[in-house]
Design a protein with these regions (language model features):
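Extracellular/periplasmic carbohydrate-active domains that bind, remodel
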Residues: 17-515
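Sec-dependent N-terminal signal peptides
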Residues: 4-13
């Protein structure tokens, strides 16, 4: 009798830990996905929390958005953590806050009709050592951050708004005249070469950028001067374990939206991730050097790559040497983005064991995008993609671009690409990226500019790719270059112009079974 009573008590306690009121994802949901993987996928545990609640209203949070609620929200999180964990509740309302740090064993739950704005006041954001776009640098504190935390979650129905339009440079070419004038009137700032910057310091920092968006600064005092340029990613978890993000909306991030780095056991489910289509570096989710990840039933409508796998850039990424591995992406929709599902270009630590199933891409610049360039190094391998539909794709449905130049698909001139392609091929070294052992099947595409484009490196061709049961209607067909080991089985390309398939002389070991 005592044993039965004890078991019932344990069951009651465990049930209270993950009450459906605070999160709906179950371990069974995730286990069903991980068991379906084409590779050996470890169990991804759902974090559990004690049955204790802490309402930010009790700590002085202002639901009108007039006063900052940073201290109240952080106090609630800290108190919850100090007492062994539980759930911090942000009730219905409008909240203005600075950066908040999530702590171990804390679930942040947002009620319906709740929106959290992150104030763009630079004084609230400290500068610290960080990684951005795959290399070490300095950035401002991320609005939502966690460092080496375990068992953390953000759930509920609320919206997190990063106020990114106060941070991001903006190109006039991406706006209508009315939108441009409205932005200048509301935000002030300065304009240089038809690009808006929040202030002169941000423009100054741009002049120090030798490669993309990371300034090369040797004078430490200058970092504070150019602070407005050091846009943070909105959610940044580093070295964390057992993570759940569920049900909420993340939008309007200063740079990338969601960025777990060097984390383990991550579940993203039922999320709505949004950024304006013109947002500079407005990625959806960037999984960097993480393992055991499930992304399920999420919606993305963003300004850059939507669902992206990364692992560091060039020598710093290779030195870190942590791949992104064991990832499942299932039942996701992408509306706008530079790519629906993307590997790279920062993949120097490697990417392996990734399965993408049942995805829909509507109007993304590219559907499935694999990109890198000389100097990266790293290996992308064991990628399995099945069941993808895509429509209204203005560039490629499937793209392998090993001459990536840092611009969105379609933005680079033919002369720029030709200059890189015509350069003398170097010897294979640790700086040579490799893409191999990739299966893509059951893909349907309609209204695509070019169905498929493979452009590998002459010194390291794209290796061992299987394309099976694919149908695409496009303006142009499929073009393959620098590929070794290509299986084309039951693939139907319907081009409006030219040939359905074009294989350059640099393609080897091809087997084609066309419909």
């Amino acid at each position: 009798m005592k044993k039965i009573t004890y078991l019932l008590l344990v069951a009651a306690v465990l049930g209270a830990c993950n009450s459906p009121k605070f999160q709906t994802t179950t371990q069974r949901d995730i286990d069903q996905l991980t068991k379906s993987a084409c590779f050996e996928m470890p169990k991804v545990p759902i974090p559990a929390f004690p049955n204790r609640t802490y309402n930010v209203a009790d700590f002085g949070a202002d639901p009108t958005g007039i006063m900052l609620s940073t201290e109240a929200i952080q106090l609630a999180i800290d108190d919850c953590n100090a007492n062994g964990g539980g759930t911090v509740i942000i009730p219905e309302g409008i909240y203005m806050t600075g950066p908040i740090s999530l702590k171990s064993n804390v679930r942040l739950y947002t009620e319906k009709n709740c929106i959290i704005f992150f104030d763009h006041n630079l004084d609230l954001y400290d500068i610290y050592d960080e990684w951005f776009e795959g290399i070490p640098t300095k950035r401002c504190t991320s609005p939502i951050n966690a460092l080496y935390a375990e068992n953390i979650a953000i759930t509920g129905h609320g919206t997190f708004n990063g106020n990114g339009d106060w941070w991001r440079p903006l190109k006039k070419a991406k706006m209508t005249d009315a939108q441009w004038k409205k932005h200048l009137k509301e935000k002030g700032g300065i304009v240089d070469n038809n690009i808006w910057y929040p202030d002169s310091a941000s423009l100054l920092a741009q002049s120090y950028c030798l490669d993309q968006n990371v300034p090369v600064i040797t004078d430490d005092s200058l970092w504070q001067v150019v602070k407005s340029f050091l846009r943070p990613v909105m959610l940044h978890f580093v070295g964390c374990k057992n993570i759940l993000l569920e049900g909420v909306t993340f939008e309007n991030s200063p740079a990338w939206n969601l960025h777990p780095m060097c984390c383990e056991n991550i579940v993203l489910r039922d999320l709505n991730v949004r950024n304006p289509w013109y947002s500079q570096n407005g990625d959806g989710v960037d999984i960097e050097s993480c393992k055991n990840v499930v992304i399920s039933h999420c919606s993305f409508d963003v300004g850059d790559d939507a669902i992206c796998m990364k692992s560091g850039k060039d020598k710093p990424g290779r030195d870190r040497g942590i791949p992104t591995e064991n990832v499942i992406v299932d039942d996701c929709v992408v509306y706008h983005g530079h790519g629906g599902f993307v590997c790279g270009s920062e993949m120097s630590g490697g990417i392996k064991n990734v399965q993408v199933t049942n995805n829909l891409y509507i109007g993304t610049d590219v559907g499935l995008r694999f990109k890198s360039t000389r100097g990266r190094g790293g290996v992308v391998e064991n990628i399995y993609i099945k069941g993808v539909n895509m429509v209204n794709i203005p560039n490629e449905g499937l793209l392998f671009d090993l001459f990536y130049g840092g611009k969105a698909a379609g933005e680079e001139s033919e002369e720029e690409l030709a200059a890189r392609m015509n350069a003398t091929a170097p010897e294979v070294s640790e700086e040579t990226p490799a893409f191999r052992n990739i299966v893509i099947e059951d893909v349907t595409g309609m209204n695509i500019k070019r169905a498929i484009y493979f452009n590998g490196l002459p010194e390291m061709k794209i290796q061992n790719v299987t394309l099976r049961n694919i149908m695409m209607s496009a303006t142009y067909g499929a073009l393959f270059r620098q590929t070794d080991g290509l299986m084309i089985e039951d693939v139907l390309i319907l081009p409006k112009e030219g040939e359905a398939f074009t294989l350059a002389p640099t393609v080897e070991n091809v087997k084609i079974n066309k419909k």
